[in-house]
Amino acid sequence: MAFRLEFYRTVAGSEPALEYIRDQVKSHRAKIGRALQYLEDTGHLARRPQVDYLGNDIYERRVAIDQHQHRLLYFFHGRSVIVVTSGLLKNEGKVPQSVIERARKYRVDWLKRIGGER
């Protein structure tokens, strides 16, 4: 099944995940791009260690580059759309709950504006 990757956009027009990616050095952007392509190619079939479920319909795509642990948070919209909400550089431990909560709020906003589950 083909998946389509989209980036969450706030009402004000900012795209937190794209902004995070653009802020990275070129070599990291390239690897993050390949990681997102993998996610688009595999969708629900992607498994650990590449992805993990964080709860409340939020997942993370893990991207390890040298000593850097990038995380891209996303959710599924219907059967074919993956919405990437935000990114972060994880230093240690779990993804902070505040970051997961923000991704969950982005999901609620997306569903409200786009029209619920498809």
Model-derived segments and their meaning:
Residues 1-69, 78-82, 88-118:
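Basic, Lys/Arg-enriched alpha-helical interface segments
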